[in-house]
């Protein structure tokens, strides 16, 4: 379950940024999570809920943006929605696809409070 280590890394990163700015509390955390990122979204959410306990993020509002997968066929250049990493082009059937969106897994922003 690598989602727990990802959740812990998110908490460490955010707490480090809060500490560097002299903040005692993180009020808001905004995440972008792509459907093609390779994480189980529900498992990550559960792990994050567990990882924030006792941290500066414990009472933070967590905003999650889910990014749908999108790819472009390298053969016919059709842009199409992707449900899986190895989705074929719906136009020509090619598997030579460049992923345009959906692999994101990042902290987009944090809101901190100094006391």
Curated annotation (Swiss-Prot):
<feature type="binding site">
    <location>
        <position position="73"/>
    </location>
    <ligand>
        <name>Zn(2+)</name>
    </ligand>
</feature>
<comment type="similarity">
    <text>Belongs to the HypA/HybF family.</text>
</comment>
<dbReference type="GO" id="GO:0016151">
    <property type="term" value="F:nickel cation binding"/>
</dbReference>
<protein>
    <recommendedName>
        <fullName>Hydrogenase maturation factor HypA</fullName>
    </recommendedName>
</protein>
<comment type="function">
    <text>Involved in the maturation of [NiFe] hydrogenases. Required for nickel insertion into the metal center of the hydrogenase.</text>
</comment>
<feature type="binding site">
    <location>
        <position position="89"/>
    </location>
    <ligand>
        <name>Zn(2+)</name>
    </ligand>
</feature>
<dbReference type="GO" id="GO:0008270">
    <property type="term" value="F:zinc ion binding"/>
</dbReference>
<keyword id="KW-0862">Zinc</keyword>
<feature type="binding site">
    <location>
        <position position="2"/>
    </location>
    <ligand>
        <name>Ni(2+)</name>
    </ligand>
</feature>
<keyword id="KW-0479">Metal-binding</keyword>
<feature type="binding site">
    <location>
        <position position="76"/>
    </location>
    <ligand>
        <name>Zn(2+)</name>
    </ligand>
</feature>
<feature type="binding site">
    <location>
        <position position="92"/>
    </location>
    <ligand>
        <name>Zn(2+)</name>
    </ligand>
</feature>
<dbReference type="InterPro" id="IPR000688">
    <property type="entry name" value="HypA/HybF"/>
</dbReference>
<dbReference type="GO" id="GO:0051604">
    <property type="term" value="P:protein maturation"/>
</dbReference>
<dbReference type="GO" id="GO:0036211">
    <property type="term" value="P:protein modification process"/>
</dbReference>
<dbReference type="Pfam" id="PF01155">
    <property type="entry name" value="HypA"/>
</dbReference>
<keyword id="KW-0533">Nickel</keyword>
């Amino acid at each position: 379950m690598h989602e727990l280590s990802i959740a812990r890394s998110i908490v460490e990163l955010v707490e480090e940024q809060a500490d560097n700015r002299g903040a005692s509390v993180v009020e808001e955390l905004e995440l972008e999570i792509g459907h093609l990122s390779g994480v189980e979204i529900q498992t990550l959410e559960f792990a994050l809920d567990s990882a924030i306990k006792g941290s500066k993020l414990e009472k933070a509002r967590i905003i999650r943006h889910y990014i749908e997968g999108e790819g472009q066929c390298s053969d016919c250049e059709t842009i199409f929605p992707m449900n899986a990493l190895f989705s074929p082009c719906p136009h020509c059937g090619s598997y030579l696809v460049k992923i345009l969106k959906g692999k994101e897994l990042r902290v987009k922003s944090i809101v901190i409070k100094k006391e």
